[in-house]
Amino acid sequence: MKLIVLIFFLLFINLNYCLKIKEQPKVGGIDSEQPTNSFYIENGNFLMNNQGNGGSLNQYQIISGSFHYFRCLPELWVDRLTKMKACGLNTIQTYIPWNVHQPNGFNTELVATNDLIEFLRQAQQIGLNVILRPGPYSCAEWELGGFPYWILEQQPIALRSSDSVFISAVIAYWSRLLPLLEPLLFTNGGPIIMVQVENEYGSYGEDKSYLETLLTLLQKYLGQGDGNGSGVLFHSTDGPSAQMLFGSKLEGVYQTVDFGPMPIEQIQDNFKIQQTFASKPTPPMNSEYYTGWITNWGDASAARTDASVVAQGLDDILSLNASVNMYMFFGGSNAGFMNGANSNSPTTNFEITIQSYDYDSPLSESGDTTEKYFAIKNVIEKYIKPTTNSNSTLPPIPSNSTKVAYGTIQITQATSLFNNLANLVNSNQQQLQTGAPIPMEQLQQSTGFVLYETTMNIAQSSQLSITELHDRATIFINDEAIEDTQTIGQAVFLQRPFNSSIEITYPSNVTDDGNFNLRILLENQGRVNFGPYLNDRKGLLSGGVLSGQQYLGPWNNYPLPLTNKTLSNINNWEQIKDYTLSNTPTFYQATLSLNSTNDIGDTFLSFTGLGKGQLFVNGYNVGRYWNVGPQRTIYISSVLLHQGDNEIILFETLLTQPIFEIQFLNQPYFD
């Protein structure tokens, strides 16, 4: 009897031990003995089975908003995400720009992936699912549509195609990126419910081999995504036309459409078009419902869409039991040099996206709730359905940030670009001498400026012509800018695509043999991000510079990416009262002194009195400013400021007169 009891006791201990082993979760949070999360399409509806929320199967209406993590400082993510959740959203959508995570060349290690993963985890912790758009093409009014600059080093190359060179680069990138995302799929306990294949490809081409290659790669690393709860749901996004939907159609990929506010009859028509190539009923979904629009430098005014119009369109969409993603819900900023551009004709059109990506979104660039936010919230609350396994009460809305008008502060020091060339050339990028000026890409440079330098002679023609200019050039004769006779105090510049030639005046201080120095400061104003002209290399292209009918040369090429590292090397500072070189590209320095942490808040630098250039705050490249408008201020987050002295640096490229002061306001201004 004792033996039988002992045997049963040992069996019980062994069984209990086995059960404890089975209780250990897999990577990604899945319990090996529990049913996994699932998200799939059935009978024209999204169905979700969320084990972390009771495990019941429910219809799911996606109410999503776009938030690009790369347009917002990480310290501010939780605030923006929480405000999105508090508005009633259950999902967010974001791109993953290739140039953010693999900026340094083909087959190189990825960077900033921890930031991406942290962003996705924060979204999940706040209760938001994620629609992911991993590229390889993004658009997004972002530099080169998200492609890294080095992809253009290979010429010719066909982007967004089955071109073997392009595909090999995609494979090298995705083979590193996608495995990092797999544990974060909804079926693995993460927040990712949908993954987009390419981006609005129907507006671009019909290379099915390319799309099939992308889908095969996604399935290899993220699962088959069969639409029945296995893996992740793959989808595409296109405008509501049969032609566009045909261009991106792939077997097993759920097709969605995108459009802005319009009458409900047109919305219904668009959702009918969405079903054109569907083999079974699918949920109607607008995956880019436009809450605002793009603004470009030189526009008469910033793009605006009335809050009531946006809210009515959203109400109509949700009333049809359709799902929606609002593009954008929070826009953010194009920090550094990362704004995109558009061109529908290389010879007549080049539009540059402004530094602010406010987009007239429900959350402003500084993260403030707006009239549009509350109009949208009122609509969403009509459609939030309480369930037995979730609390439909929305969280409280976080307060808006403190805004401070620091007023006018004095410029204290200045120094010329030309006195700092050796300091500013990146240690990995040396000055090169070539027969003709070479593009940025051949200098292994992504963004910023290039200075081209050569020698001319007074015997040569004074008519200078640049054969192909991308994008903006300022001419210096013996280190002095050619002044604009129409706009006093500004330098003459050549601007793509409007003008590429100039009549120069010979200087009086030439050498004995008649030689003088010619310098051209070239600015990359943002690579094209959409359309047929994506192969947008930067610099002086196609032969270089003509004096009359003669090509000039040889040339010294100085790459000037103006990174945080190179910026710290600036020296030869002079007191502003003694500075006499303001008709050259100039760095200006000022100090914003904050006595305590209570003094720190968001602020806005006014462009008043400035020309065109770049703003740096404590070494951080905040972005471009330009007096053509309609953007008139540049947002500076309190995250960039600290107690004590804060260094403000302007790199001014347009004005030929010195700058003596700058002004900080407590609100943004747009024309």
Curated annotation (Swiss-Prot):
It is found in: Lysosome. Glycans are attached at N228, N321, N391, N400, N499, N509, N564, N595. GO terms for biological process: galactose catabolic process. It comes from the Eukaryota. Keywords: Glycoprotein, Glycosidase, Hydrolase, Lysosome, Signal. SUPFAM superfamilies: (Trans)glycosidases, Galactose-binding domain-like. Belongs to the glycosyl hydrolase 35 family. This is Beta-galactosidase 1. It comes from Dictyostelium discoideum. The gene is glb1.
